[in-house]
């Protein structure tokens, strides 16, 4: 690993550069990921760290940044669309009484505080009014294999507000099949209409609101004659927010249909793996990969595979 400044957890062939506002992971001449931990975002867009661009080993971009339909969609990022009346997502909030979205002075920010060890980041969540509600520890690892690379990600969120926090979504507030909250990926325009493959023979846009421990999205690129696959692995029983139209998006939701209460002082932890692969992986290839790379393989959160 070659780094300048803050450490990160990467395997031997990955080089890392810290610019003071971003961590850039490279495999040779290919930039795989740019993790922007000090973003220049407006309050309305919900300032928070994000990973964009994400690229395959072949160099194809597999994420979107500030699309004109949702300016707060930025690659891959951790979010909370409804948190005790606050919006750590960005943009307008869904209001049950109005039956729609409206702009409110409730858009919070997730602030990078420091890197405390290899791949380990400390963040704090603040409401638009300046109240400190959550302390988060986020751990990341980057690992490269023959035709794909993997981002391992874990998050531990601790309630420091002094009263219960309720994690929800537009669906918990009355909008059907819109339960987005948590780790969210926005795909490039060319991935619109892509293929969704999920655990247990499931697949397609019908995965919206269904449960699975993993879900893959296969999309085709513009300009080059190539496809790419993103595989998202989460805990068993995860409910997914997924769209293929009008845009590509995947989210293992924190609170799709029911609010989750986090008591004062309590910590809520989640672990994910995102595989970025060259080519259109079929179900057999995906299932083989999941079997050989179990999420609960005993590695510590953020620990890479050697």
Q: What is each stretch, according to the model?
A:
Residues 2-75, 145, 164, 168, ...:
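Beta-strand-rich N-terminal accessory domains
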Residues 22-27, 117-124, 151, 217:
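Generic recognition of long tandem-repeat/solenoid scaffolds
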Residues 35-38, 43-53, 145-194:
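Acidic (Asp/Glu-rich), glycine- and aromatic
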Residues 58, 125-129, 140-144, 157-161, ...:
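Beta-strand elements of well-folded, non-transmembrane domains
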Residues 77-147:
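Extended, loop-rich substrate-binding clefts of extracytoplasmic carbohydrate-active enzymes
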Residues 164-235:
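Active-site/ligand-binding surface loops and adjacent short beta/alpha elements
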Residues 228-305:
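Beta-strand-rich recognition/accessory modules
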């Amino acid at each position: 690993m070659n780094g300048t400044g803050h450490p990160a957890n990467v395997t031997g062939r990955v080089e890392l550069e810290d610019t003071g506002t971003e961590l850039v992971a490279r495999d040779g001449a290919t930039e795989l990921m740019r993790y922007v931990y000090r973003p220049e975002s407006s309050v309305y867009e919900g300032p928070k760290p994000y990973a964009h661009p994400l690229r395959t080993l072949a160099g194809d971009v597999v994420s979107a940044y500030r699309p004109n339909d949702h300016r707060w969609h930025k690659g891959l990022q951790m979010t909370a669309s409804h948190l005790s009346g606050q919006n750590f997502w960005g943009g307008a909030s869904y209001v049950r009484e109005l039956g729609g979205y409206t702009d409110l002075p409730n858009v919070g920010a997730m602030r990078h505080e420091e890197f405390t060890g290899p791949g380990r980041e400390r963040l704090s969540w603040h409401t638009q009014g300046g109240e400190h509600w959550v302390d988060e520890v986020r751990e990341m690892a980057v690992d490269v294999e023959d035709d794909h690379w993997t981002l391992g990600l874990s998050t531990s969120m601790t309630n420091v507000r002094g009263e219960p926090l309720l994690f929800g979504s537009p669906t918990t507030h009355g909008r059907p099949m819109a339960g987005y909250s948590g780790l969210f990926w926005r795909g490039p325009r060319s991935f619109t209409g892509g293929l969704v493959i999920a655990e247990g023979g499931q697949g397609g846009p019908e995965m919206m609101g269904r449960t699975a421990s993993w879900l893959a999205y296969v999309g085709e690129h513009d300009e080059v004659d190539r496809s790419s696959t993103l595989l998202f692995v989460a805990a068993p029983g995860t409910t997914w927010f997924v769209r293929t139209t009008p845009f590509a998006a995947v989210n293992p939701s924190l609170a799709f249909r029911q609010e989750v209460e986090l008591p004062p002082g309590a910590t809520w932890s989640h672990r994910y793996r995102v595989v970025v692969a060259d080519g259109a992986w079929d179900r057999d290839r995906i299932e083989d990969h999941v079997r050989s790379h179990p999420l609960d393989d005993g590695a510590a959160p953020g620990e890479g595979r050697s």
